[in-house]
A protein has these predicted regions:
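Short, basic, glycine/proline-bearing loop/turn elements
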Residues: 64-65, 133-140, 168-171
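Catalytic core of membrane glycerolipid acyltransferases/transacylases, capturing the structured
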Residues: 85-143
């Protein structure tokens, strides 16, 4: 994202917060750069493709993820003890940077982490190859593909992997506040009888500024205690309870880190 685009994105974020439209995409999307996600898409690759992806992950993705968090993003991690002893789980996180998947993946190091993403993330070229090797599970408007995705998620969770879902839906660059959550992540957790692992990214000032005077921010990934489904509740009750609890935890973490009350500027 160049400096001029950043200014427009920040203006759009301010506009949509005032309108209460927290799930609007504000970053330019170029679908011409995306590969189709149809009924033939291999969410869990087999044969040669499996070997290729594993090699790409070990040779390129994991070393880059480690170096990027340490040297570029300067990410800090708090609460890793909350991941101890966990197997399959759904990670939720606020979506505030194109590369926050690198921070989430590093936060859960020691676990294999996959990422549910919008179809436009299934990119052509080297970047797309690295995203797929890094665990991208793209959504689709193809019903058969979506059924395949749901089956793949269940299989991955059953094997003890973690799957990341961004319940706010859209990426809002450097946005500090938690936004209202969609049901998807919590429905998946309830259906598969696995916990939610809430993560919430907060920002630290760097003291450095870009060409437009916008301060460069460093991320801290706050890993909170898992939220488990309640076997005594119905599916809908569980989804609502887990979603509301996750959102409450993020709101409390926001107020703890920034030392101010969470308030949205809306209706003006």
């Amino acid at each position: 994202m160049d400096e001029n685009t950043r200014l427009q994105v920040l203006a759009d974020i301010e506009k949509y917060e005032r309108l209460g439209e927290f799930d609007r995409h504000v970053d330019p999307v170029d679908m011409s750069m995306a590969l189709p996600v149809d009924e033939n898409y291999q969410y869990i690759p087999k044969g040669f493709l499996k070997i290729k992806r594993e090699l790409e992950r070990k040779i390129y993705v994991e070393p880059f993820r480690k170096k990027a968090n340490k040297n570029i993003l300067k990410t800090e991690f708090r609460g890793r003890e909350n991941l101890e002893g966990l197997g399959g789980a759904i990670i939720t996180c606020n979506h505030v940077n194109k590369f926050d998947c690198l921070a989430v993946g590093q936060a859960a190091k020691g676990h294999r982490v996959y990422f549910i993403g919008a179809p436009f993330n299934n990119m052509k070229g080297f970047m797309g190859e690295m995203m797929r090797a890094g665990g991208l599970l793209p959504l689709s408007d193809n019903m058969t593909a979506m059924k395949n995705l749901n089956r793949a998620i269940s299989a991955l969770l059953a094997k003890g992997n973690m799957v990341t879902c961004y319940p706010e839906q859209a990426m809002w660059w450097n946005y500090e506040k938690p936004r209202p959550f969609k049901d998807g992540a919590f429905s998946i957790a309830v259906m598969n009888k696995v916990p939610i692992v809430p993560m919430f990214i907060t920002f630290r000032n760097s003291g450095e500024f870009d060409a437009n005077g916008i301060e460069i921010k460093y991320m801290t990934v706050n890993i909170m205690k898992p939220i488990y489904p309640d076997v005594t509740l119905s599916r809908r009750e569980n989804v609502n309870r887990m979603r509301e609890e996750n959102y409450r935890m993020c709101c409390e973490k926001y107020e703890e880190i920034y030392q101010k009350k969470l308030e949205y500027v809306t209706g003006e």
